[in-house]
Regions:
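Glycine-rich phosphate/pyrophosphate-binding loop and the adjoining helix
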Residues: 1, 29, 67, 139-188
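Conserved beta-strand segments of alpha/beta enzyme cores
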Residues: 33-35, 58, 144
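N-terminal beta1-alpha1 ligand-phosphate binding loop
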Residues: 1-32
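A short beta-strand-loop structural module common to alpha/beta enzyme folds
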Residues: 32-42
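Helix-loop-strand module that forms the ligand-binding subsite of alpha/beta enzymes
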Residues: 60-144, 149-150
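Cysteine-cluster motifs in flexible loop/terminal segments that predominantly coordinate metals
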Residues: 42-72
Length: 188
């Protein structure tokens, strides 16, 4: 059993990564293997709508997507984490969502039946839209989306500031516990 946390922030070691590590720790405590996959520094281009993925489970764009897609395909649970940039998820995570989503969707709904959900970090506004944006991706692709004690959102702008948001940390922790619970039930 494995859960991966994909961090869509271009800032290494920032609030989104801190929150994702916190969530993954809760999952690991329940005996599920975890892996953090930061997209910072990677080259993830947007989808060009070439439709090559409709006939082959790959993308012809030459960048860092396919090794991550293979990890997504092998994982039992996927968490997508993004800070809010201008009221939306980052371009980095959206490029991954578009392309990995199309590849999976056109190739036997490859993510259907996996567990997944979002984590969002915001300075102030845009968190609800970004949370919905990420959640809808999971829903369209047939994921089981576990609950938490609130929306999986935390507050933080300056590096490390998210650690002061006790409710946000607790929500991410409880989400992680729900992810592990659901993965274990589905694998039983």
């Amino acid at each position: 059993m494995k859960a991966i946390g994909i961090v869509g922030s271009p800032r290494k070691g920032g609030n989104t990564e801190i929150l994702t590590k916190h969530c993954l720790k809760a999952i690991a405590e329940e005996g599920v293997e975890t892996e953090l996959i930061p997209l910072a520094g990677l080259d993830i281009k947007p989808c060009t709508a070439c439709m090559a993925c409709k006939t082959k489970e790959t993308c012809p764009i030459k960048d860092d997507l396919m090794p991550i897609y293979k990890k997504m395909r092998a994982a039992d649970a996927i968490i997508l984490a993004s800070p809010v940039y201008y009221g939306s998820a980052t371009a980095l995570i959206k490029g991954l969502m578009e392309r990995a989503g199309y590849i999976a969707r056109w190739n036997g709904r490859a993510f259907a039946g996996k567990v997944g959900g979002p984590l969002v970090v915001a300075r102030r506004a845009g968190k609800n839209f970004t949370f919905a944006q990420l959640t809808l991706w999971f829903q369209i692709l047939g994921f089981f989306i576990p609950s938490s004690t609130y929306w999986n959102v935390a507050i933080g702008r300056d590096k490390g500031e998210v650690e002061k948001d006790e409710e946000g940390l607790e929500t991410a922790w409880n989400f992680g516990k729900s992810v592990a619970f659901l993965v274990k039930k589905l694998k039983a």
